[in-house]
UniProtKB/Swiss-Prot annotation:
Transmembrane segments: 18-38, 114-134, 161-181, 196-216
Source organism: Mesostigma viride (Green alga)
Protein name: Potassium/proton antiporter CemA
Superkingdom assignment: Eukaryota
Homology family: Belongs to the CemA family.
Keyword NADP on entry: no
Cellular component, GO, one term: chloroplast inner membrane
Record membrane topology: Multi-pass membrane protein
Protein localization: Plastid, Chloroplast inner membrane
Length: 236
């Protein structure tokens, strides 16, 4: 009994230490690659070989919307101000300065998006190499996770199952998926295609829900039928 507890404690310490070390390693590598190597290269390519101001149509729409909002705010402030009456020359100068500021911001956003694409690809390649060469460590972590899941009571297993399904495939999950896809597209500098986003939100949670139910039927129902019964009762 004591040996089992010591073994479990040792596995827990190893898993936590390994995951934290990997997380810090990949975060550090990502920042170094992005800011010291790939971003300067992307900045050189964009500023020397690209004539367009915007990377995609979505970025252009966002910048124009910000410029329009700024113009409306300026006009409103001048209309209600007794000290500074409405002056077209002042408005034009302020608009010109704001346009240059937004153009500079758009330029940096485009450079960052290009650098993110190459950095993400390199990090994905490093993770793939890690999965191939660290099979022993991954097997230890997988064994620990299995033991931890098996040690949970049926009520706790059912709670985590319901929590997972409600977050990823629940009624309100579509809003979260929509925000996540928009953030990913912006991160990679891709246009925010509304049709693609709506199609993804309409189909991906359904596919995920189907795979989850298939996993319950094929795997969980075999190793822990009581947990499945508790899960169904809690769902009802």
């Amino acid at each position: 009994m004591i040996n089992n507890q010591e073994s479990l404690r040792s596995q827990t310490f190893f898993c936590i230490k390994y995951i934290i070390s990997l997380s810090f390693f990949f975060i550090l590598i990502y920042q170094l690659l992005n800011f010291l190597v790939l971003r300067p290269y992307a900045e050189y390519l964009w500023n020397h070989y690209q004539t367009d101001v915007f990377l995609n149509s979505s970025q252009e729409e966002r910048i124009f919307a910000k410029l329009q909002n700024f113009e409306e705010e300026m006009q409103f402030d001048m209309l209600i101000s007794y000290t500074y009456p409405l002056n077209p020359q002042v408005l034009h100068k302020e608009m010109e300065e704001k346009a240059f500021e937004l153009a500079h911001m758009s330029n940096n956003e485009s450079i960052n998006s290009i650098a993110h694409v190459f950095t993400d690809l390199l990090i994905a390649f490093l993770i793939f190499c890690l999965l191939i060469n660290a099979k022993k460590e991954i097997a230890i972590i997988q064994t620990y996770i299995d033991q931890y899941i098996y040690s949970l009571t049926d009520a706790k297993k059912s709670f985590f199952l319901i929590l997972f399904t409600d977050i990823f495939v629940g009624f309100h999950s579509s809003h979260g998926w929509k925000i996540l896809i928009e953030l990913c597209l912006t991160h990679l500098g891709l246009p925010e295609n509304k049709g693609f986003i709506f199609l993804f939100v309409a189909t991906f949670p359904v596919i995920l829900d189907t795979l989850f139910k298939y996993w319950i039927f094929l795997y969980l129902n075999r190793i822990s039928p009581s947990a499945v019964a508790t899960f169904n009762n809690m769902n009802e």
